[in-house]
């Protein structure tokens, strides 16, 4: 069975891993980095992903960041003169990860396990799966990020029973999961979180502070200047990271804008104490889900054996201190917070292929599911933290006499009134026979698969007529849209491949011209003019093709030059070898001649 790669599709950074033997290994990107910025930019019709895209974010307005925060919504982003869905942008990141994983493995990759925040709802999970499909990946499993982290942490501890709390604060989302580990079973007891809390919010606090201070000093509002704001974003992210290791950092942004008197510069010192003060409310927000998860799991703090930190934002000292204060435990730092999720996803891939044995993953649904009933009430069918996959049925009836149809309004959330929860979808069961209210028996069945994706069925028990839908929110894509996007993605991949081949050819041509000119110069007056002339003629032909910018001609002329240059190099080598041989022969003769001069006459006296 072909390899299943594990992908952590993050808000700020993404990573890809693969199982090698029994070890999960992070695959470095072409720049040698183990994580890849989740950034996409467009330039001259070219799609740029990762480090290169992030580097040009300041100067290129067609740059998209933090697209994960829009997954599951109908919001689109404008770039490159077009509108893109979050699924399409995410697919570009996935395609890039897939591409360099294939380069590393030396084979095509078609299957992946992709992670999502535990608190992602159905629409967000479906959007992630669609993004994988657009990127040419069969998504074998959607796994919750804290669960994947627990897999990576606990794979070598299957003989030990323990309860762990995974605290996962990433670039844009926050999750807390509590798991019980033992005998190879990873049982998620509860999960809680906040999809609107992450490292980006900590960056924003610094940005807001810098904008306010600059306005106070110079009377200019930088928040209206897009390029200045991107520079501030980069500086804020760097300052946040610096303050994890030092207590003070200097923010220096020369020529940030211009005033009446000329250019203005931003120079500011940010202390860790000030940063902690600015972000105090964000740190406080992390405490509520911790308490919620413990309560839902029915556990006290003393029953938690280990606290695992996941996500780059858990390096913030104030966050670490808050975790210690809230749990009463020193966090376990045995895993790399940036890499552990992708590694866990690769392990789940190994479980699917059978390469990892005796491991069972029991995950849960993060939010309750149900339907709207009379009076706008939200009636739950499946409670949050129910182990998945699962199925649950309940019988309902009509609200009016002779009601010919029922509307099924499917919701996800925890609030008692339907209007306050997230609508997943609506459908109708029609042709109900005329009868007094309360008589028809309508059975509603919810199914949640192992990926946390919901399907709902309504059945009239009297007529046996039924209606089923796989939930598709208003942000969902139709099969036709996904097919079109897949074709676009394939075309882009083909265009990228051609562009790379073109760059490689131009580099080869430059290298061949340089090397041949050097060889022709070195062989001047060495007695093989015919070969030199042939190489020179081929060189001139290649230069002409290069000037004409004819790629096919360049390829043909490069092959011809390589052949002629090789003939010249052979002659040069033969001449050098003959000279070497002659020199060695002369040295041998000299040594033999000198041997006679070393004979000394001596007298022998007999005693």
Swiss-Prot record:
InterPro entries: ATPase_NBD (IPR043129), Chaperone_DnaK (IPR012725), Heat_shock_70_CS (IPR018181), HSP70_C_sf (IPR029048), HSP70_peptide-bd_sf (IPR029047), Hsp_70_fam (IPR013126)
Stretch list, region Disordered: 580-607
Gene3D superfamilies per the UniProt record, alphabetical: 1.20.1270.10, 3.30.420.40, Actin, Chain A, domain 4, Substrate Binding Domain Of DNAk, Chain A, domain 1
Any one GO MF annotation of this record: unfolded protein binding
Acidic residues bias locations: 598-607
Superkingdom to which the source organism belongs: Bacteria
Keyword presence, Amino-acid biosynthesis: no
Stretches of the chain forming a coiled coil according to its record: none
Induction: By stress conditions e.g. heat shock.
Phosphothreonine modified-residue sites: 173
GO BP terms in the entry: chaperone cofactor-dependent protein refolding; protein refolding
Protein keywords: ATP-binding, Chaperone, Nucleotide-binding, Phosphoprotein, Stress response
Low complexity: compositionally biased ranges: 580-591
Phosphoprotein as UniProt keyword: yes
PANTHER family, alphabetized: HEAT SHOCK PROTEIN 70KDA
Function: Acts as a chaperone.
Family: Belongs to the heat shock protein 70 family.
Name the record gives this protein: Chaperone protein DnaK
GN (gene name): dnaK
